[in-house]
């Protein structure tokens, strides 16, 4: 079944995506080496709520986190924990935002400073090139 979206629905979806981008950018600016992944999860929740949005994943199928966060070779859908972020950790965050009953859900990966691990840089560049 195909559900057609109204102009209002499409506008709300665009707003949700704009909020997602703001949360992503602010999260990347504020996450620092020495934070735990649970602190990153809590920060993401604060940022999402700041824009009057809802963290989509929280309590979905009993998921305990606000976002999914995985470090280095962990599989996606990781849960924030007491793991302390280290220099050159590769972090993948999957963020779902519900805004006006519409969802924006996407993941991104970045390398924590000083970002001088050439093997991690290569995998990110190769993956990006394949997707684009």
What is each model feature region?
Residues 1-132:
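Active-site neighborhoods and metal-handling regions in enzymes and metal-associated proteins
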């Amino acid at each position: 079944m195909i559900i057609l979206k109204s102009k209002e629905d499409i506008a709300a979806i665009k707003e949700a995506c704009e909020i997602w981008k703001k949360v992503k950018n602010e999260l990347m600016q504020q996450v620092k080496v020495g934070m735990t992944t649970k602190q990153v999860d809590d920060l993401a929740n604060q940022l999402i709520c700041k824009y009057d949005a809802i963290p989509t994943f929280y309590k979905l199928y009993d998921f305990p986190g606000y976002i999914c966060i995985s470090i280095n070779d962990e599989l996606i859908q990781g849960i924030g924990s007491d793991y302390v972020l280290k220099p050159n950790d590769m972090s993948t965050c999957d963020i779902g935002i519900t805004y006006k009953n519409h969802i924006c859900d996407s993941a991104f990966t970045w390398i924590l400073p000083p970002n001088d691990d050439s093997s991690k840089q290569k995998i990110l560049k190769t993956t990006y090139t394949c997707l684009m």
